[in-house]
């Protein structure tokens, strides 16, 4: 079917005679009488289309269709040789278009993968592969200046390796195939070096094509090759420009998909197909990581390049956060997918930048550059946090590494920068749009998280004049722009509580810029009103676990061995009395509204309890705090949790109060059993670290509880 006709043989003859490397176009023969009597074959027509394509000729489509069907190696080599002379793609390096030439890479990935699946009955795959490789090697040999033509083809071939492995790991003639893989990788590296040594990188589109090709074939490019390339070309800036500012990438956030609510998933796929840098954001970020790691040039110069790159990324993030105010919940519209890729790429780049400081053996550079880089990266995360808030960071450890490293960098080397960031972020939030803007809420949440990290070590001015007033307004629902009854503010409300709890630990701080007496006095004044607030907001706004954490944190601040206890011992007594009185007076309301058929009504006596339990096969034992059904029981449990901290002189008194006044009076049988068990756990836990107090508790239990229930001892 695919034996050469007259035109094909003429072309093959010209190629074999070396005409393929000349500037003259190949001549199609067939004017003589004898030649005219021969019928051209399909391959002849294909070659004619390739050498003189019309504007609407889909050369790539023809290749993808015909390549796997060729029946002998000579035709495979001929088609490859001929394609390398196609004026649509390879007329001159100065007129290369990325959008036009990138499909070559995808085509050869498809061709090689498809051919591997249908190796028979046409040319076996290993021979097909060898023929393609031989043609590419011949092109390199006859004219080394054609290196730029080979790069996308070689990249496509290498991309197909994973697709082949997915089909069959150990095909026939695997040794020959592996040998061809190695030869292709070596040829690609030679072409990359020649490209950057020749000065062809001056062509923007061609250089972009090569950068994308290198990112796609990164697993097959050796470190030594990358180092040699870095001597010739500044990859750091080029990759950042390609990702964030080129029309083939994020285009300085000027992408219709980000502002047009009518787009759909088809538009997203089309966007990726038309913009190769967008399609390979992650690969480009890993290329950046590799080049930063291997760049052994001037440290000062490298860090300056990184600094410039971060400036560009920060500018992009600011524009992006202004462009997007609301994310559509319809995930099919592609905006979320694009933003997720943008975030991941940014984090990988930041991780690469920060990792360089762990490799530097120069404290001066670290001290000078790390705080500056950390400030810029945190500013970028501040602008992009709406993406993190939407998708979370579960399983994406690089984000945590970047965030915590930046925090440590500014706290350790430049605390003033950390404080400046808090002020900048706080003033950079559009509070009036918090209700409607997911981006604005995410910025506030990010700022609160940062406040939590530094509130107990920052200056008194920042803490007392900005942070504490802001979070107090939030938790007390006094901020006009935040309504805690609106579920969209739930995470902000909870984060504000976390900042206050962290603020209470300032009394344990030994930082020089903390006025000890001022802060101890302030905490002493605020801690009991805050305890009352927490109790009142449970369970409508705070969960049972959040209540437990808050009360445990407060108790450690007011009981013995704490500065507050040394300052005023009465505060611990007030703490216990407030919590106990709430346990006495609070309604026995259910924490969760159960379906009508499963509603639990607190029975009036044990006899009714036993009847109910018997109908259900016996009482169901509660396993955790979350099993508690009433607000009263949850508060009693929280009170019991602080008993290990109570002074020795008051310890048994409070055990008796909890048991007789609260636990015994609990109407629901299973909850009563749970609270009694929790009290016992408290006694045993106390004994582990304070035997004197623990012994008192055990003796108390033996005398008071064992006589009324199953003996623990």
Curated annotation (Swiss-Prot):
UniProt feature, compositional bias: Polar residues: 7-30
Alphabetized InterPro entries for the sequence: PEX8-like
Induction of expression: Induced in presence of methanol by the transcription factor MRX1 that binds the 5'-CYCC-3' consensus sequence within the PEX8 promoter.
Locus of motif Microbody targeting signal: 711-713
GO terms for cellular component: peroxisomal membrane
Localisation per UniProt entry: Peroxisome membrane
Location (main, coarse): membrane
Domain of life: Eukaryota
Alphabetized UniProt keyword annotations: Membrane, Peroxisome
Gene inactivation effect: Leads to a peroxisomal-deficient phenotype with the absence of peroxisomes and the accumulation of aberrant peroxisomal structures resembling 'membranous ghosts'.
Chain positions covered by the region annotation Disordered: 1-31
Membrane topology: Peripheral membrane protein
Function in brief: Essential component of the machinery required for the import of both PTS1 and PTS2 (and perhaps all) peroxisomal matrix proteins. Binding of PEX8 to the N-terminus of PEX5 cargo receptor induces a conformational change of the TPR domains and decrease their binding affinity to cargo, facilitating the release of the PTS1 proteins within the peroxisome.
Subunit relationships: Interacts with PEX5 (via N-terminus).
Protein name: Peroxisomal biogenesis factor 8
Organism this protein belongs to: Komagataella phaffii (strain GS115 / ATCC 20864) (Yeast)
């Amino acid at each position: 079917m695919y034996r050469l006709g007259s035109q094909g043989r003429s072309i093959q003859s010209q190629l074999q005679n070396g005409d393929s490397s000349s500037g003259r176009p190949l001549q199609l023969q067939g004017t003589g009488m004898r030649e005219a009597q021969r019928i051209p074959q399909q391959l002849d027509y294909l070659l004619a289309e390739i050498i003189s394509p019309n504007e609407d000729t889909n050369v790539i489509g023809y290749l993808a269709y015909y390549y796997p069907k060729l029946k002998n190696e000579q035709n495979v080599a001929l088609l490859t040789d001929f394609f390398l002379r196609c004026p649509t793609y390879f007329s001159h390096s100065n007129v290369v278009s990325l959008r036009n030439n990138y499909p070559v890479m995808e085509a050869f990935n498809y061709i090689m993968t498809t051919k591997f699946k249908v190796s028979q009955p046409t040319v076996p795959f290993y021979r097909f592969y060898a023929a393609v490789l031989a043609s590419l090697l011949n092109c390199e040999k006859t004219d080394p200046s054609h290196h730029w033509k080979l790069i996308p083809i070689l990249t496509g071939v290498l991309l197909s390796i994973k697709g082949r492995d997915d089909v069959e790991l150990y095909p026939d003639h695997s040794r020959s195939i592996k040998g061809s893989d190695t030869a292709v990788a070596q040829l690609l590296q030679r072409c990359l070096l020649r490209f950057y040594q020749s000065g062809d990188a001056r062509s923007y589109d061609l250089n972009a094509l090569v950068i994308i090709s290198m990112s796609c074939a990164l697993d097959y490019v050796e470190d030594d090759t990358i180092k040699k390339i870095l001597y010739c070309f500044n990859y750091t800036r080029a990759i950042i420009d390609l990702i964030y500012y080129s029309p083939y990438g994020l285009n300085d956030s000027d992408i219709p998909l980000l502002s047009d609510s009518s787009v759909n998933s088809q538009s997203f796929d089309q966007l990726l197909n038309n913009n190769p840098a967008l399609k390979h954001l992650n690969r480009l970020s890993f290329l950046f990581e590799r080049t930063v790691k291997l760049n052994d040039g001037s440290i000062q110069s490298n860090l300056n390049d990184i600094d410039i790159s971060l400036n560009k990324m920060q500018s992009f993030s600011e524009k992006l956060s202004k462009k997007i105010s609301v994310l559509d919940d319809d995930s099919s519209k592609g905006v979320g997918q694009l933003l997720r890729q943008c975030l991941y790429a940014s984090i990988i780049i930041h991780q690469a930048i920060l990792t360089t400081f762990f490799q530097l053996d120069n404290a001066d550079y670290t001290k000078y550059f790390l705080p500056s880089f950390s400030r810029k990266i945190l500013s970028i995360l501040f602008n992009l946090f709406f993406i993190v808030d939407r998708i979370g960071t579960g399983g994406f450890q690089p984000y945590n590494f970047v965030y915590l490293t930046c925090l440590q960098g500014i706290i350790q080397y430049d605390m003033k920068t950390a404080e400046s960031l808090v002020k900048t972020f706080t003033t950079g939030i559009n509070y009036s749009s918090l209700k409607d803007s997911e981006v604005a809420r995410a910025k506030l949440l990010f700022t609160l998280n940062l406040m939590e990290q530094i509130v107990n070590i920052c200056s008194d001015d920042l803490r007392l004049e900005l942070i504490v007033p802001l979070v107090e307004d939030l938790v007390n629902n006094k901020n006009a722009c935040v309504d805690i009854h609106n579920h969209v503010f739930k995470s902000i409300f909870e984060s504000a509580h976390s900042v206050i709890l962290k603020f209470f630990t300032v009394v344990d701080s030994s930082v020089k810029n903390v006025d000890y007496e001022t802060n101890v006095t302030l905490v002493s004044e605020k801690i009991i009103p805050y305890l009352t607030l927490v109790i009142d907001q449970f369970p409508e706004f705070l969960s049972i676990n959040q209540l437990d954490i808050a009360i445990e944190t407060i108790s450690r601040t007011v009981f013995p061995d704490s500065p507050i206890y040394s300052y005023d011992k009465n505060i611990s007594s007030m703490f216990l009395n407030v919590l106990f009185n709430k346990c006495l007076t609070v309604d026995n309301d259910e924490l969760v509204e159960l379906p009508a058929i499963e509603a639990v009504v607190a029975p009036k006596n044990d006899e009714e309890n036993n009847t109910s339990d018997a109908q259900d096969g016996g009482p169901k034992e509660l396993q955790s705090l979350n099993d508690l059904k009433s607000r009263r029981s949850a508060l009693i449990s929280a009170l019991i949790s602080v008993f290990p901290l109570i002074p020795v002189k008051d310890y048994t008194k409070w055990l008796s109060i909890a048991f007789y006044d609260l636990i015994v009076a609990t109407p629901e049988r299973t909850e009563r059993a749970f609270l009694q068990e929790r009290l016992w756990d408290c006694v045993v836990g106390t004994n582990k670290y304070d035997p004197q107090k623990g012994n008192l508790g055990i003796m108390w239990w033996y005398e008071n509880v064992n006589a009324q229930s199953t003996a623990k001892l």
